[in-house]
Amino acid sequence: MKFKIIAGLVLVLSVIIASCGSQEDMEFKRYYLGGEQLYKQRCQNCHGTNGEGLSNLIPPLTDSTFLKTNKKQLACIVNNGLKGAIQVIHGKSFVGDMPANDMSPVDIARVLTYVTNSFGNKMGTVTSEDVAKDLKDCK
């Protein structure tokens, strides 16, 4: 009888613990889901539903080496915009200007978490603290 009670308690506790997830997982989900909504509102019109970009004007966000090698500059690009040609994939240039965005560091972090973990990218959570630090280093 005791064994059944203990086994039942262990099972219930296991289910509860498994359903909670870690603090990091929950933080990632909050940033990602918030970023998805912001992307749809502010970025999707140019970068596309699937991050495919637009011809030679708007660069794609799909598994872009640019995102991975310029992670520290992404907050600056989102915040300040970008003018002039940019080479993103395989030396291909894109000439469309990206406007500056009036977004808080936490909203920039949300968008970057979404973009850097969608469209074939898997780069983890970008926090508002990361963004605030990166914005101080904008050139």
Question: What label would you give each PLM region?
Answer:
Residues 56-62, 83-136:
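Axial heme c-ligation environment in periplasmic c-type cytochrome domains
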Residues 1-20:
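Sec-dependent bacterial lipoprotein signal peptides
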Residues 13, 36-39, 131:
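Residue-level signal for mature regions of secreted extracellular proteins and peptides
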Residues 35-49, 111, 115:
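The canonical Cys-X-X-Cys-His
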Residues 65-70:
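Conserved helix-turn-beta segment immediately C-terminal to the redox Cys motif
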Residues 20-38:
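Electrostatic cytochrome c docking/interface patches
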Residues 23, 49-50:
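Cys/His-rich metal-chelating microdomains
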